[in-house]
A protein has these predicted regions:
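Electropositive, glycine-dotted interaction segments
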Residues: 110-236
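A short, compositionally biased
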Residues: 1, 92-97, 116-121, 252-258
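Well-ordered beta-strand positions in beta-sheet-rich domains
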Residues: 16-20, 110-112, 272-274
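Pre-Walker A-like glycine/lysine-rich segment at the N-terminus of P-loop NTPase domains
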Residues: 1-65
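Conserved ABC ATPase signature
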Residues: 46-54, 238-278
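Short polybasic amphipathic segments
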Residues: 5, 98-100, 120-126, 257-265
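Glycine-centered tight beta-turn/hairpin loop motif at sheet-sheet or coil-to-beta transitions
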Residues: 12, 104-108, 266-268
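Conserved P-loop NTP-binding catalytic core
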Residues: 37-48, 52, 61-111, 116-117
Length: 278
């Protein structure tokens, strides 16, 4: 469960920016049913991010997508010539900084990473405020079982990946949280069940439009459209010494349901965008 994330020099976030799931002092309604308590922590079970277009809402999600990519990239990284994935503000070459706190298995994890394309500058993992590993330049602290392996650590190698590969429990738990527990839905598609319900339930559609208008998206209507497209039932690849042939079996009709939003422009004109274009 996410507690907070701090980011610096990532996409539209140049200065240190914090997104926290901890409850604020002004929370009054549903303070019991909509919060999760763990020791002194009071966390919101859900949160919405509001704002105009191009104000960085999606970039909050992309923090976690980048982390997944960074960790998966470590599997393929073989030498110090490989570059770490970055997405800095305006493409600058300054370090990117992340500090993420989360709750897993009744433990509070704090993971911090500062890095550039070529190397990791700082990195640490704390569990219930106990240091599991840390790095500050060339100074590296590891669990006793990994100390003999310290000379093998590359400058572009994440200690989180290194430690979980070598069966450090807390590192494995943190790695699992980033790679498995954090689920990022496909924002270009909605589940057919949701679209069907929106098409049939006029009251649900009305409430959704009001919600979108409250978020200041200038959406005045939504429409569910069905379309049919012919797709091959089977594709075969036939190859011999000289030629490779792509064979398509029978075409079948595949039905798709899509969401379209009608926007009102600055001059009171309207235009329609599909959900994938939003």
């Amino acid at each position: 469960m996410l507690i907070s994330v701090e980011v610096e020099n990532f996409r539209s976030f140049y200065d240190r920016t914090v997104f926290s799931m901890e409850t604020g002092s002004k929370l009054r309604s549903y303070s019991t049913t909509n919060t999760h308590r763990f020791k002194r922590l009071k966390l919101l079970k859900s949160a919405f991010v509001f704002g105009g277009n191009a104000n960085g809402k999606t970039n909050v999600i992309k923090i976690f997508r980048l982390f997944k990519e960074l960790l998966i990239q470590q599997i393929k990284t073989k030498s110090e010539l490989d570059r770490l994935v970055t997405d800095t503000f305006g493409g600058n070459s300054e370090p990117t900084v992340f500090l993420i706190k989360f709750l897993k298995n009744n433990k509070v994890f704090t993971y911090e990473l500062e890095y550039v394309e070529e190397r990791v500058i700082k990195e640490s993992l704390l569990v219930n405020e106990r240091v599991i590993f840390s790095r500050n330049g060339d100074e590296i602290f590891l669990p006793d079982s990994l100390t003999p392996l310290r000379p093998t650590i590359r400058k572009n190698q994440l200690l989180l990946f290194f430690a979980q590969t070598n069966n450090i429990l807390e590192a494995k738990e943190a790695y699992e949280w980033f790679v498995i527990d954090v689920v990022i839905p496909n924002t270009n598609k909605l589940h057919p069940t949701i679209l069907k319900e929106l098409k049939q339930n006029k009251e649900l559609k009305r409430k959704l439009i009001l919600f979108l208008q409250a978020a200041d998206f200038n959406i005045v209507d939504i429409e569910i459209r069905d379309r049919t497209e012919q797709l091959p039932s089977e594709i075969l690849l036939k190859s011999n010494d000289k030629n490779t042939e792509l064979m398509i079996r029978d075409l079948i009709d595949q039905r798709f349901t899509e969401l379209y939003c009608t926007h009102r422009g600055a001059n009171e004109d309207t235009f329609v965008l599909s959900f994938s274009e939003e």
